[in-house]
Amino acid sequence: MAFQGHQARKRFGQHWLKDQTVLDRIVAAADLQPSDRVLEVGPGRGALTERLLSSPAAAVQAVELDRDLVDGLRERFAGDPRFSLRQGDVLELPLQLEDGVAASKVVANIPYNITGPLLDRLVGRLDRPVEPPYQRLVLLVQKQVAERIRARPGHSSFSALSVRMQLLARCTTVCPVPPRCFQPPPKVQSEVIQIDPLPADKRLPSDIARRVESLLRQAFLARRKMLRNTLASLAPEPQLQALAAAAGFQLHQRPQELAPQVWVALARGLNQGIDAASADGHDHGDGSGQGESSPGGARDQI
């Protein structure tokens, strides 16, 4: 094969998954059906690809950044017409399959240095979710990221990512993956997670979603500060206290202590206040305009 002797490259974050049990668990979690069209990110030398093609899936399209692996992958799977391959950066390429049809499921051993941006592309954010949503994503990620996704309020790992993902999808753990399961072994623990994005009719209304996203950016950029301080620009303190009481939290709390639904309740309260202000012609000083700006460079900080 063309990639025999190819060594994993640090600059691509390559760690070949070699554990047969973990490979089987990933494919089992994907629950592939004859109607499924699979997008595989980072096939490497094809260990997971082989199992995906052993499933009843209708098509498997792999996206590989490393040019030196492309010929070997095409040679290895040349006999299966369901397989296709594109070389390039998954963060930049269009994600439709070669025939222009969207994939129904995503399976990936993600290079850990692109996990955040890739989740943005595959799941989206509250104010711009991926449309249409994938039915399921099964991803091998760094354990620290998995912990942040599933963290509960008050846990040290709880973050804006926790709130966002728990409002956009059902996220569950498939299995832990220790370093010995890879070649070469990474220096961190890993985990396979299953993400089932919510259908459009189960998501937040767009105005509430935009408001929650704005609140998360504002609050978690200063996660050690009390909400009395980080939310001060939204309303005078008496009004802010009333909003907090209605949403079910106190202003001396910090953002990582609030459950996802509390953020939703706060967003609804703020939006209702803005609607009331618009109706009676008064300015309640909620400062809503500043929250609609693009997160820009703040994206990776939260």
From Swiss-Prot:
Gene3D superfamilies: Ribosomal RNA adenine dimethylase-like, domain 2 (1.10.8.100), Vaccinia Virus protein VP39 (3.40.50.150). It catalyses: adenosine(1518)/adenosine(1519) in 16S rRNA + 4 S-adenosyl-L-methionine = N(6)-dimethyladenosine(1518)/N(6)-dimethyladenosine(1519) in 16S rRNA + 4 S-adenosyl-L-homocysteine + 4 H(+). The keyword Cytoplasm applies. GO terms for molecular function: 16S rRNA (adenine(1518)-N(6)/adenine(1519)-N(6))-dimethyltransferase activity; RNA binding. Keywords: Cytoplasm, Methyltransferase, RNA-binding, rRNA processing, S-adenosyl-L-methionine, Transferase. It is found in: Cytoplasm. Belongs to the class I-like SAM-binding methyltransferase superfamily. rRNA adenine N(6)-methyltransferase family. RsmA subfamily. NCBIfam families: ksgA. This is Ribosomal RNA small subunit methyltransferase A.
